[in-house]
Amino acid sequence: MPSDGAPQGRRAVAVAVRRDDGLVLAVRRPDEPGEELRGVWGLPAATLAEGESDEEGVRRIGREKLGAELTIGRAVGYGEQERDGYTLRMGVYEASIAGEPRLPERAAGATTLYTAIDWLPVASFREAAERGSLCCRVLVEART
């Protein structure tokens, strides 16, 4: 934390992978004690490592969390949210996927292991947005 007491910032990215029928790739977060947004369906997302670009973060989400290659597209939107002890700044991007997403085994260093994958309408992300999911709020507000 900076010496002036201001909250430290963290950057993150999330992806909105859309099929031709308009459904968006959704992942279910673990329903475990201590997990943020337990059991909620949301967008695949990742906190960026120091020096990691948004595009690199999107590709990492594909490899580590979806077992598929992602290509970044246009920005859906950006958001900021105060969390416990830090400020989260997130970009949500459209992305295309090569192959079918799958739940890989826990990768070394991965912080969230999703428990399920599905394709849902954008309106389905409203619950997660209301429960505090920044990426889902950005998606729902953009109405893409």
Give the role of each language-model region.
Residues 23-65:
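Conserved Nudix-box catalytic region and its N-terminal flanking loop in Nudix hydrolases
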Residues 79-105, 118, 122-123, 138-141:
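Active-site-adjacent beta-strand/loop module that shapes the phosphate/pyrophosphate-binding cleft
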Residues 68-77:
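A short coil-to-beta-strand element that immediately follows conserved catalytic motifs
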Residues 48, 125-126:
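A generic structural signal for short hydrophobic patches within well-formed alpha-helices
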Residues 102-111, 127-132:
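Short, charged, solvent-exposed linker or helix-capping segments at domain edges/interfaces
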Residues 132-144:
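Charged phosphate-binding loop/patch that engages nucleotide di/tri-phosphates or the phosphate backbone
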Residues 1-25, 44-47, 78:
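Conserved N-terminal beta-strand and adjoining loop/helix that marks the start
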